[in-house]
Amino acid sequence: RYRKIYLKKVGNKFQSSILDDHKVIKFLKPKIKLGGCIIDCQSSNFFARRDWFSAVFVARTDLSILYDRLEHKGYTGSSLKNNIECELFEVMLLEAYKSFRPKIVYEIYNNTEEDIVENVEFIISILNKKKSVS
């Protein structure tokens, strides 16, 4: 659940909200310890406890598709440029490989609706495999 109490500030140069990492982790910690959580986050640097995760999926998109999606969402200027550059230079993928054991990092592409369906099936299969091993 998204709660405004976890925001530090709004209105930086990217016109976006900044999460208070400490408050978010404090909120998530008891839930994650129970297991079975799926966390959707833009950055893996956010989590100090790498052992919380059995799989990390990095969603990628072709640049032309990403550009159109971001424009459609109203991204402009530095926000648009930063998002495109992050994808171009594989920032999130490299961050995930640096932050977690490479064998638990999976790169998936979300270019089409078919990709999304295939990715859901792939993610479920990976999680089921990990569940049967543990």
Question: Where in this protein do the model-derived segments appear?
Answer:
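NTP-dependent small-molecule kinase module
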Residues: 72, 97-134
